[in-house]
C-alpha cells in the first residue's frame, strides 16, 4: 500500500533510538515532525529534529488528542518501546483513557495497539507503517552471511518467524 505523505508528520515516541532516527530522517527529507514523547530518555535528542516535542504520559488521552488537533496532524508513526510499568500507572489515566480501556477485551499488546489505531482513525489521523521513515536502517532481504541456508534450514526459519508472530498475538513473553 502506497500512501501520499503529508509534509507535517506526527511521531508518538517511546524509549530508544528508533524514534530519534525516524525524526532525523524525516527532517533531513523536508518533513516537519511534531512529537509526543512518552520517554524522558531520548527527549533531548528528539528536540534536535522535531519542530515541537510534547512530553506526555500514555494515559493523558485528552491532552494527546488536543495536541494532535491543535497541531493539525493527519499522519502519525508510533516508534519506540513503552514499558508496561509506565502504562500501568493508573493515577495518570484521564477519564478518556479509562473510557477507552473499558472497551478492551484483553490487555495484550496487539489488542491495545489496534484500539489505539482505531481511536486515531476516529480523529482523522492515519497511523503509518513504522518502517516508512526508517527503511534505511533495515537489513535487506536475502542471505546475509557467506552460506546460503539449505531448504530444511529455510523451513526452520519460516516456522520460527510464523511462531514468533503467533506468540506476539497471544502476548507470550519475548517473541
Question: Where are each of the predicted segments found?
Answer:
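N-terminal glycine-rich phosphate/adenylate-binding segment common to multiple enzyme folds
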Residues: 64-132
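N-terminal beta-loop-helix "entrance" segment that forms/cooperates
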Residues: 38-58
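Short gly/pro/ser/thr-enriched loop/turn and capping motifs at secondary-structure boundaries
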Residues: 19, 40-44, 61-63, 84-85
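Short coil/turn connectors at secondary-structure junctions
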Residues: 5-8, 29-32, 50, 71-74, ...
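Internal active-site segments that recognize and position negatively charged phosphoryl groups
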Residues: 116-129, 137-175
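Conserved active-site and cofactor/substrate-binding residues in soluble primary-metabolism enzymes
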Residues: 13, 17-21, 56-63, 107, ...
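Glycine-rich loop at the start of a catalytic domain that most often binds anionic cofactors/ligands
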Residues: 25, 47-52, 89-94
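N-terminal basic/disordered segments at the start of proteins
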Residues: 3-38
Amino acid at each position: 500500500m502506497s500512501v501520499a505523505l503529508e509534509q507535517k508528520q506526527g511521531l508518538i515516541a517511546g524509549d530508544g533510538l528508533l524514534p530519534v532516527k525516524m525524526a532525523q530522517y524525516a527532517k533531513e527529507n523536508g518533513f516537519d515532525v511534531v512529537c509526543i514523547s512518552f520517554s524522558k530518555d531520548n527527549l533531548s535528542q528528539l528536540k534536535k529534529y522535531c519542530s515541537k516535542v510534547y512530553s506526555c504520559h500514555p494515559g493523558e488521552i485528552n491532552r494527546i488528542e488536543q495536541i494532535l488537533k491543535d497541531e493539525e496532524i493527519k499522519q502519525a508513526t508510533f516508534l519506540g518501546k513503552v514499558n508496561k510499568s509506565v502504562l500501568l500507572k493508573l493515577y495518570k489515566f484521564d477519564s478518556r483513557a479509562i473510557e477507552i480501556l473499558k472497551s478492551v477485551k484483553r490487555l495484550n499488546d496487539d489488542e491495545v495497539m489496534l484500539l489505539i489505531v482505531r481511536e486515531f482513525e476516529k480523529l482523522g489521523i492515519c497511523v503509518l507503517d513504522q518502517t516508512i521513515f526508517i527503511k534505511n536502517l533495515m537489513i535487506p532481504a536475502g542471505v546475509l552471511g557467506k552460506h546460503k541456508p539449505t531448504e530444511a534450514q529455510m523451513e526452520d526459519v519460516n516456522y520460527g518467524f510464523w511462531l514468533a508472530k503467533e506468540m506476539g498475538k497471544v502476548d507470550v513473553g519475548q517473541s
